[in-house]
Amino acid sequence: MPHIIFLTFLYVGGKKLETIKKNEVKTGKVIDLTHEGHGVVKVDRYPIFIPNALIDEEIKFKLIKVKKNFAIGKLIEVISESDDRVTPPCIYYAKCGGCQLQHMTYRAQLDMKREQVVNLFHRKGPFENTVIKETIGMVNPWRYRNKSQIPVGQSNSNQVIMGFYRQRSHDIIDMDSCLIQDRQHQEVMNRVKYWLNELNISIYNEKTKTGLIRHLVVRTGYHTDEMMVIFVTNGATFKQSELLVNKLKKEFPNITSIKQNINNSHSNVIMGRQSMTLYGKDKIEDQLSEVIYHISDLSFYQINSSQTEKLYQQALNYAQLTGKEIVLDTYCGIGTIGLYMAPLAKHVYGVEVVPQAIKDAEDNATKNQLKNTTFECGKAEDVILTWKSQGIKPDVVMVDPPRKGCDETFLTTLLKLNPKRIVYISCNPSTQQRDAQILAEQYELVEITPVDMFPQTTHIETVALFVRKDEE
């Protein structure tokens, strides 16, 4: 039976130029990077995306996927290297999906992330005059994660494996180190891996939906060094929990909380809704500036504490608080940014849809004796209209939504509220740009500052200042 070869014919201006076929080896010069950090080579204007390639490099690559409008290539050889290329320090980098940019100098990473924001805002929508600052980076862009979520599995020989997922899969790469995790977290991971094997504790199997241990989660207070260890289990029965607790307490004296989180769902969601404390406190503490925060196993808290302080300080600079302003903190979570601003504001109102987060925010306000704060549970668009009817008129609104961005209903309600300034923090500049087009009806997008919260990855966070047009 003859081999079937699939060809893609390239057409430019109706003229057929060249054929591209899967498994073909080609050479070319990288002219750009995608938002995922992949190098772009063009053959007669047809784009080919090659991971781990850098701009201006001459490379040899193999075509591994060919589509009508693009192809994916695999880097075989770098014929001429970019000055921005470095040797990745992590031995798992070629396989692990956790990092995408370790082959790039840190300076080049910061430049690439700013360029992403420039491409989004200067080339689409009415934002060509918006100032986009240099990316705020880290002095040491390693070991920055204060939370590690580590999947647990078993090898073919029934040995416990722990690490992170292979690129674009749920295959666990067994690891004993990770250069972006807190060093203590990898030490806990390695000891727990040994004990799970030693005690013959059953491990969850994604295919059969059986077994007990699904994930190990470790959280650390960056400024307090308090540590929380969480066993995510497929069910409540955890007979050997006491043995594990005693081993952890003995070996890691700074552990102040050990918890079990129950996740019976057959999904990719890591944590379930029910938790119980096996040892110590229900929460750990961390501190940003002068504010102390209580953090539970389910709390949303920024992963990179040192960069969070820079992010919030930039937001504070944009807010221009003098002590006379009413601040509205939407999507407030456990109150992190609202409480950070409270010492410099007249009053801070926070709204969040998650009841436990509001309780945590109130507890954090009490802990810090910040009496000029009010937190309420509900949809932001509903609660802020209630506050408006009560005569509460904010001068500054803080917006920090999830990756999907803001609901359009919320944005139209925000326009009715008409504050002087809006400070919008985003973990997804694409949805921030979409939302900015709605706000542009009444607001000038004055400035955006990218902040590198996740070095060695393609992720970028931004903080943007919107000023009401009659205030300019």
Residues covered by each model-derived region:
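Rossmann-like S-adenosyl-L-methionine
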Residues: 2-26, 35, 240-472
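Terminal RNA-binding accessory module
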Residues: 7, 11-92, 382
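Short, acidic/hydrophobic/Gly-rich beta-strand patch recurrent on exposed beta strands
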Residues: 39-44, 163-166, 230-232, 361
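Short, conserved phosphate/pyrophosphate- and ester-handling motifs at nucleotide-, phospho-/glycolipid
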Residues: 56, 181, 304
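Hydrophobic beta-strand signal
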Residues: 60-62, 149, 328
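Extended interfacial segments that mediate partner engagement and assembly in macromolecular machines
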Residues: 76-88, 97-203, 223, 238
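Short, solvent-exposed loop/turn elements at beta->coil junctions and helix N-caps
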Residues: 133-141, 206-207, 213-215, 219, ...
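Short, aliphatic-rich beta-strand segments
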Residues: 218, 225-234, 292-296, 396
